[in-house]
A protein has these predicted regions:
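A generic structural signal for short hydrophobic patches within well-formed alpha-helices
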Residues: 34, 67-70, 150-151
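Conserved beta-strand segments of alpha/beta enzyme cores
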Residues: 59, 100-102, 161-162
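Short, well-structured N-terminal submotif of metal-dependent ribonuclease cores
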Residues: 1-62, 74-90, 157-158
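Short, amphipathic alpha-helical segments that act as regulatory/interfacial helices
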Residues: 71-75, 137
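Acidic catalytic patch
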Residues: 40, 64-68, 90-121
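Acidic, PIN/NYN-like endoribonuclease modules and their adjacent C-terminal/linker elements
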Residues: 1-22, 108-122, 130-166
Length: 166
């Protein structure tokens, strides 16, 4: 049984060269990975669960955007395995109460030119992906996603180690 504890919050910090040289361990999970983990009938559930099992030592993270999107998507009537909103929120809350989880505050702005080159955004569909990758990079986290078309050139601080495509 997972250990229960108060939610851990990742504290944003200034990049340090020594810290940046090492591969970040904790991973901010994209909403598509969260959904695959929570929905045992999801086509990518086994792949997401295997990846998390192999990487749980570093821990995992979520943020308000990924949590809200997970609840919204999994509870909408068009979702194949839709559940009531309260049930999805309960399952996600249980997952985030484990010792391996940390909450990442969304304290990085897409408008901050220090973090993002918005001239590289090719369209509206890249905005959230670029933001989440930038949030991960700003907090020295990996960003785990199923999305192979990640707009990494938008994020100024990113390196290949920050992006994990499952």
């Amino acid at each position: 049984m997972p250990s229960r504890r108060a939610p851990k919050v990742v504290q944003a910090r200034e990049p340090r060269a020594a810290c940046r040289a090492a591969r970040p361990k904790r991973a901010l999970l994209d909403v598509n990975v969260l959904i695959a983990l929570l929905d045992t009938d999801h086509i990518h559930h086994a792949r997401a669960a295997a990846w998390l099992s192999d990487n749980i030592g570093g821990g995992w993270a979520s943020c308000a955007i990924t949590q809200n999107a997970c609840v919204r998507i999994m509870s909408q009537p068009g979702y194949p395995n839709a559940l009531p909103t309260a049930r999805v929120a309960e399952r996600l809350r249980e997952a985030t109460e484990t010792a391996a989880h940390a909450f990442v505050p969304g304290d990085v702005s897409l408008l901050a030119s220090r973090h993002f080159d918005t001239e590289q955004l090719l369209g509206h569909r890249q905005v959230t992906d670029a933001y989440l990758l930038g949030l991960a990079a700003a907090n020295d986290l990996r960003f785990a996603t199923f999305d192979g078309a990640m707009p990494s050139r938008v994020v100024r601080e990113t390196r290949p180690a920050y992006l994990v495509v499952l």
